[in-house]
């Protein structure tokens, strides 16, 4: 009887873990999506990178995107 209960609980645990993992995979932001600074929203191997925007020397806020970790964009010299 104990074996049946233990087996049932083990199966329930496995099914619960699989369901949680599937929900977490669908909730991430793909590459190029707008994100916030909390890095948790981007999919794996992506980071939330933020850049300050300026127009005519005046700061116009900050934009953040999910981009590959370690990738850096720079302004092209004119």
UniProtKB/Swiss-Prot annotation:
This is U7-lycotoxin-Ls1d. The keyword NAD does not apply. Keywords: Disulfide bond, Secreted, Signal, Toxin. Coiled coil: none annotated. It comes from Lycosa singoriensis (Wolf spider). GO terms for molecular function: toxin activity. Belongs to the neurotoxin 19 (CSTX) family. 07 (U7-Lctx) subfamily. It is found in: Secreted. The keyword Disulfide bond applies.
């Amino acid at each position: 009887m104990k074996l049946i209960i233990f087996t049932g609980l083990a199966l329930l645990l496995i099914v619960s873990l699989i369901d949680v993992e599937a929900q977490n995979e669908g909730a991430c932001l793909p590459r190029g999506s707008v994100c916030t600074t909390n890095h948790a929203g981007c999919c794996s191997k992506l980071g939330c990178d933020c850049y300050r925007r300026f127009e005519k020397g005046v700061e116009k806020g900050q934009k953040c995107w999910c981009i590959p970790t370690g990738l850096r964009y720079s302004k092209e010299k004119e």
